[in-house]
Amino acid sequence: MYETMIAKASTHELLDMNTSLIYGSFTYSVEGELMDLTGLWISNEDAFIFYLENEYVYLLKKFAYKDIEVLEQKISIMSMTKKLILRFNNKESYTLLVANGEANVFASRVNERIEKVRLD
């Protein structure tokens, strides 16, 4: 599923040489209803993106780095996995549960991009 989603993201031109991405589960409101989704969080030069495409759901939501406060890392005690918390300037937040060890690299890259936008 992970590889398929990356291939689909590539066809939508969401990935480039400087893209960082991570796969996991998160809750998102679709048509006013909260849904547990499994998809990609993508960080490229232009935007931070939630992406999911399957037979049931298509989600492509882009966020400007200027609207993001920070991407935090924590450990989920319940699931014993890492979680990333994307916090926006308007106090909205999203949490992604990730199973792989790439959370550190992904969070560092995203926070570098947020800081770069702040300094510009």
Locations of regions flagged by a protein language model:
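Anionic N-terminal interaction surfaces
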Residues: 1-42, 120
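Generic signal for short, ordered secondary-structure residues
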Residues: 20, 26-27, 47-48, 85, ...
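Phosphoinositide-binding peripheral membrane targeting modules
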Residues: 32-83, 92
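Generic hydrophobic/packing signal
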Residues: 72-75, 88-90, 110, 114
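Canonical phosphoinositide-binding patch of PH/PH-like domains
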Residues: 88-109
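C-terminal partner/receptor-binding element of secreted or periplasmic proteins
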Residues: 104-116, 120
